Amino acid sequence: MHSSVITFPGSNCDRDMDVALKKFGFKNKMVWHDDVELPKSDLVVLPGGFSYGDYLRCGSMASKSKIMKSVLNFAQGGGKVMGVCNGFQILVESGLLPGVLLRNKYLEFICKNVFVKANNKDNSYFKDDKKNIYEFHIAHNEGNYFCSNDQIKEINDNNQIALFYSDENGNVNEQSNPNGSLQNIAGVFNKQKNVLGMMPHPERMIDPALSGEDGSIFFQNLINNLK
């Protein structure tokens, strides 16, 4: 399985993602934002960080990078694209995913572990995974997912919500919502379920000595389903 991680000016989780992908068997290549062509890829990842210093809006400038034309074409052709944190913001800004990501409810940067509940398993990212609740790390200032009434109806009708913020027992409620996201949304798919955006960082949870192993379960399941 071949993967590509896009590095933008200000990305700071690209190397973590590279380590995670290689650990679970991907042949990964790092791709610079100014490149025009994607290498052979079964999966393209837009990593976390602060692309272009988060100027204008988070992910706005990165969404106009040269490489994004190839990413858009790859996704529109059915290729698997995953955006984590700032990568999620870039996917929203590029129009590959619906909605927007606003400032956190209490206007504070949030950096902590959270529990998330997988909602839809009819896709390559969570299919066949027996685990429903993951403990992942979040670190963001603009992770408050929002969209219009028409959009949220369509998202629910199409089963596009990938992850909910929850407690450790899978209860989705206001108490388990760290940033004010609409309906506790932590991640969404496009209609075709080949593009995933998520605020939590699975790549930070692949070593039990440092953090936890729930990210390992996510990546192992992902490569199994892409084979």
Swiss-Prot record:
Superkingdom of this protein's organism: Bacteria
Disulphide bond pairs: none
Principal localisation: cytoplasm
CDD domains xref list: GATase1_FGAR_AT
InterPro entries linked to this entry: Class_I_gatase-like (IPR029062), PRibForGlyAmidine_synth_PurQ (IPR010075)
Positions of the catalytic residues: C85 (nucleophile), H201, E203
Location within or outside the cell: Cytoplasm
Recorded catalytic activity of this chain's protein: N(2)-formyl-N(1)-(5-phospho-beta-D-ribosyl)glycinamide + L-glutamine + ATP + H2O = 2-formamido-N(1)-(5-O-phospho-beta-D-ribosyl)acetamidine + L-glutamate + ADP + phosphate + H(+); L-glutamine + H2O = L-glutamate + NH4(+)
HAMAP family on file: PurQ (MF_00421)
Classification via PANTHER family: PHOSPHORIBOSYLFORMYLGLYCINAMIDINE SYNTHASE SUBUNIT PURQ (PTHR47552:SF1)
Protein name in the entry: Phosphoribosylformylglycinamidine synthase subunit PurQ
Origin species: Pelagibacter ubique (strain HTCC1062)
